[in-house]
Amino acid sequence: MKLITRALFLKALPASVLLTGFSSLLLSGAVSAQDSAPTFYADALPLFQKNCVACHQPDGPKVGGITAPMSLMDYDQAKLWAPMIKNALITGYMPPWGAHERHRGEFKDERYIEDNELATLVAWVDGGALEGKPADAADQSGQIAEAGGTVLPDSGWWIGDPDLVVQFDRPVYVKDDIMDWQPTVQMPVPEGAHTEPKWVSKAELAPGGPWVHHIVSSHMGVGVPGRGPFTYPEGWGVLMPEDPFITVNMHYHKDPGEGTAITDMTRAGFVFYEDGTVIDHVVETNLLPHSGWTIPPGDPNFEVTNTHEIEEDIYLLSMGPHMHYRGKAMRYEVEYPDGERETLLWVPDYDFNWQFLYEYQEPKFLPAGSVMHMSWWFDNSTQNRWNPDYTAAVEYGPETTDEMANARIYYAPTTKRGIVVGNDIPADILETARKEEQNRRERANLLDQSQDDFAWLTEDSD
């Protein structure tokens, strides 16, 4: 299915948005059109182009497996959705972005809408969602280009034309009775396509659909619905050793029951650095998970904390908080060696449906001896509409109905390596990259031996 249905979109909206939305629909119909009221072409469209059309465009592209339910470049669709647009905006549901306003300007691809822009769009809806004259609109393609390259390239990949594309040998079949499943699967590399180690500059995961809860790979990082591609800063990269397979850990989550089986053909694309490029910083990642706690039944604000010491000078590239349905808020802080404390990331309203990677505009220096303080808050009460079971005592676990308290970071030591792409690769880096892939492959073998049913390996998905 190309587009998410309107019903599915409405199901995902908070109840307050729906109630206010339909009330707004009744009220907006009673508002008389005035000559001074904003119009779609003159007022709303430019703001949609600036803030929304990265997803909400004709034949909207998938961003991490999610497709927007309508195009906001089309007047008829925008008018139909106008009440929902207003309330998604005023409640902060859209544009989707978790980082607090205090972080404005710190992270790439941030999604904040200005107060005056919000007021204009609300006035457009309240004024009857008037069309206006198409001649009042500026050149659409020009505005989209100025908005930061929000049009999907002809290649179908946000990273442009990949140097390498891998996918499953055949679709993965997730049966009716499965709700959560975490197979570790190998994606074969096309013969002759990857015969020597390569430095990755860009990587994009294309989940087969919203039932893909996450994808983990040594070379691609972590992919979840709604998260875009990895594009490393100039001089930063990840080494992909030559190998006939790319091993990925998949986590599928869906409602079980008759007729719910799905087939998945997740893909991944890579762009490599050209020979002669200098790699100064080899990207490393740390999940920083924390377990050993239990969320009491009905607790609306359960807090979990953990610390992590920085043992060498590093540049912090990005942060990716991760919880499940009971996740409420998350904070990263750093305590410097002199005792000064700074908030690195504050996500006051965590949304399981939008799991962003917050990448700094410029990598942030953290000196050796600094201590990271991580805090997670969970809502296990009836007030949490996503809560699978408020009567359960919840612990850290792999199922989506369990919980997690992860604080993934991407970083690199500050010491420059000066590795020239195309020349010999330092032995320590090559050994580490090969070991990571081998460890993941061994876990795949262990999974094969322990799973009772691997019908998807042979079952016809037609």
Listing of model-derived features with the role each one plays in the protein:
Residues 1-11:
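N-terminal secretory signal peptides that target proteins for export/translocation
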Residues 11-28:
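Bacterial N-terminal signal peptides
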Residues 31-190, 195, 202, 208, ...:
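Aromatic- and Gly/Pro-enriched helix-to-coil junctions and flexible linker segments
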Residues 204-208, 318, 419-435:
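Acidic, Ser/Thr/Pro
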Residues 149-417:
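His-enriched metal-coordination microenvironments in redox/metal-binding proteins
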Residues 145, 421, 430-433, 437-450, ...:
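Intrinsically disordered, low-complexity segments enriched in small/polar and acidic residues
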Residues 73-93, 386-392, 415, 420-421, ...:
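Extended, polar beta-sheet/loop recognition surfaces of beta-rich domains
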Residues 129-133, 276-279, 414-428:
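Short, charged low-complexity linker/loop segments at the C-terminal edge of domains
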